[in-house]
């Protein structure tokens, strides 16, 4: 794909991520709050608080993967694979906290 060409599914992915950010603001905020708590924590609390952060990120990642997969299932296999790559890349740019393991879901 040319660097000057917009991704094929960019518009639908933008709308999906807009919807995620509106409907799941609590999940995004919780992950941010958990990370802030971990960063402020004393050493003896840090491990548990990091686990809480990871759990919050996993929740967001699962929700995003569900959105991706439900749309992907409406496409043929080749287009579905292209859409999945574009979706995962868009999550990495827009919501990087939730992108680290999205390709594993």
Q: What is each PLM-predicted segment?
A:
Residues 6, 39-53, 73-84:
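Alpha-helical rod/repeat scaffolding segments in eukaryotic adaptors/tethers
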Residues 24-68:
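Amphipathic alpha-helical interaction modules
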Residues 72-105:
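Amphipathic alpha-helical binding modules
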Residues 1-38:
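Short terminal alpha-helical segments
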Residues 11, 40, 52-55, 85, ...:
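Intrinsically disordered, low-complexity regions enriched in small/polar residues
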């Amino acid at each position: 794909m040319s660097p000057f060409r917009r991704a094929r599914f960019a518009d639908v992915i933008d709308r999906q991520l807009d919807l995620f950010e509106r409907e799941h603001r609590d999940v995004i905020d919780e992950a941010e709050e958990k990370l802030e708590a971990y960063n402020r924590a004393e050493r003896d609390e840090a491990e548990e608080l990091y686990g809480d952060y990871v759990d919050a990120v996993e929740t967001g990642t699962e929700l995003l993967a569900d959105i991706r997969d439900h749309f992907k299932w409406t496409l043929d296999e080749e287009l579905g694979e292209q859409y999945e790559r574009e979706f995962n890349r868009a999550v990495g740019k827009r919501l990087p906290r939730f992108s680290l393991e999205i390709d594993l879901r």
